[in-house]
């Protein structure tokens, strides 16, 4: 039997706040703010990184790679940090060949991108 939640999925996406200018520290401080301000307790549970998080090119294996200057600890560590706060972590991808900002899209890379995100 399915249950109905009292609220729709609620969270935050980095684009409208930071646009191109995202980094590891901003995402961590946003997760901290969700907890400290009571947003998490109010039902906000998603922290989603939008466009501009990756390098401009895929690696030699065809995988998306986080921008090492913006995310020096990598996405796994950042995801673990967000999860440690009791929140859920999401990463933007695009179904086209490139994102709106010109970063690699997932077209014809869907399987490897899904694997990368899961890791």
Regions found by a protein language model. Give the residues of each.
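Aromatic-lined carbohydrate-binding/catalytic grooves of carbohydrate-active enzymes
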Residues: 26, 30-119
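An acidic-aromatic substrate-binding cleft motif
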Residues: 1-19
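Structural helix-adjacent loops and short alpha-helical linkers that scaffold large soluble proteins
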Residues: 22-23
């Amino acid at each position: 039997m399915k249950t109905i939640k009292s609220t729709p999925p609620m969270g935050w996406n980095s684009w409208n706040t930071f646009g191109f200018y995202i980094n590891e520290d901003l995402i961590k401080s946003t997760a901290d703010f969700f907890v400290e301000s009571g947003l998490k307790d109010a039902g906000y549970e998603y922290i989603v990184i939008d466009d501009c998080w990756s390098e401009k090119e895929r690696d030699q294996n065809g995988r998306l790679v986080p921008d090492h200057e913006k995310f020096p600890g990598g996405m796994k560590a950042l995801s673990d940090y967000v999860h440690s706060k009791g929140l859920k972590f999401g990463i933007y991808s695009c179904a086209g060949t490139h994102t709106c900002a010109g970063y690699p899209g997932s077209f014809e890379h869907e399987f490897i991108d899904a694997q990368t995100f899961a890791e």
